Each structure stands twice: as C-alpha cells, then as structure tokens.
Amino acid sequence: MASVGECPAPVPVKDKKLLEVKLGELPSWILMRDFSPSGIFGAFQRGYYRYYNKYINVKKGSISGITMVLACYVLFSYSFSYKHLKHERLRKYH
C-alpha cells in the first residue's frame, strides 16, 4: 500500500478505460483491444448490459430509456435514407 505522501502505482494503458486514456496513448490503446468476433461481441454485450442497468432496470423507471432507443432508431434510419429523400425533394413532378 502507498503511504500518505506517495502516488499510487500507474495503471497500464491496456487496463484503462477509453475516457481515462490520454491522446498520446490512444493509438497504443486501440492496438491492444480485442478485435476478434468474440471480443467485439463481448464489447457490445457489456454496452447493452450497462445501458439496460442504467436506464431500463431501475427502481423508479420512466419512459426515457425506451425513448432514447427510439430516437436513435429514427436518426439512424433518416441518415441511411437521406440520399433517397434528397433526390425526391429535388424532383419537380412526383
């Protein structure tokens, strides 16, 4: 254990979270990530459980968690269909 005046031991770059990584350490941090299919699946699974426990699985729940999912769906679907919608808007006769 560190005494009162000493700094704690530095955390290795691999064990840091994304928000704790400095800009100079970012390329090495990205290269240390697991990009295998199981690693990517695990990252999505951790994100899902984190979102679910923060917004859906709460004592006093509200509609905010589901509303965020629906808002993201609407924004992504609009961004994917924007190219098609833009061409329809520029037509003179429909």
From Swiss-Prot:
Membrane topology: Single-pass membrane protein
Major localisation: mitochondrion
Listed name of the protein: ATP synthase F(0) complex subunit f, mitochondrial
Residue list for modification N-acetylalanine: A2
Description of how the protein assembles with itself and partners: Component of the ATP synthase complex composed at least of ATP5F1A/subunit alpha, ATP5F1B/subunit beta, ATP5MC1/subunit c (homooctomer), MT-ATP6/subunit a, MT-ATP8/subunit 8, ATP5ME/subunit e, ATP5MF/subunit f, ATP5MG/subunit g, ATP5MK/subunit k, ATP5MJ/subunit j, ATP5F1C/subunit gamma, ATP5F1D/subunit delta, ATP5F1E/subunit epsilon, ATP5PF/subunit F6, ATP5PB/subunit b, ATP5PD/subunit d, ATP5PO/subunit OSCP.
Gene Ontology CC: mitochondrial inner membrane; mitochondrion; nuclear membrane; proton-transporting ATP synthase complex
Family the entry assigns: Belongs to the ATPase F chain family.
Top-rank lineage group of the source organism: Eukaryota
Record PTM Phosphoserine, positions in chain: S3
InterPro entries named in the record: F1F0-ATPsyn_F_prd
Record's subcellular location: Mitochondrion; Mitochondrion inner membrane
Purpose: Subunit f, of the mitochondrial membrane ATP synthase complex (F(1)F(0) ATP synthase or Complex V) that produces ATP from ADP in the presence of a proton gradient across the membrane which is generated by electron transport complexes of the respiratory chain. ATP synthase complex consist of a soluble F(1) head domain - the catalytic core - and a membrane F(1) domain - the membrane proton channel. These two domains are linked by a central stalk rotating inside the F(1) region and a stationary peripheral stalk.
PANTHER family recorded: ATP SYNTHASE F CHAIN, MITOCHONDRIAL-RELATED, ATP SYNTHASE SUBUNIT F, MITOCHONDRIAL
Keywords: Acetylation, ATP synthesis, CF(0), Hydrogen ion transport, Ion transport, Membrane, Mitochondrion, Mitochondrion inner membrane, Phosphoprotein, Transmembrane, Transmembrane helix, Transport
Listed transmembrane segments: 68-85
GO biological process per UniProt: proton motive force-driven ATP synthesis; proton motive force-driven mitochondrial ATP synthesis; proton transmembrane transport
Residues where N6-acetyllysine is found: K22
Keyword 4Fe-4S: no
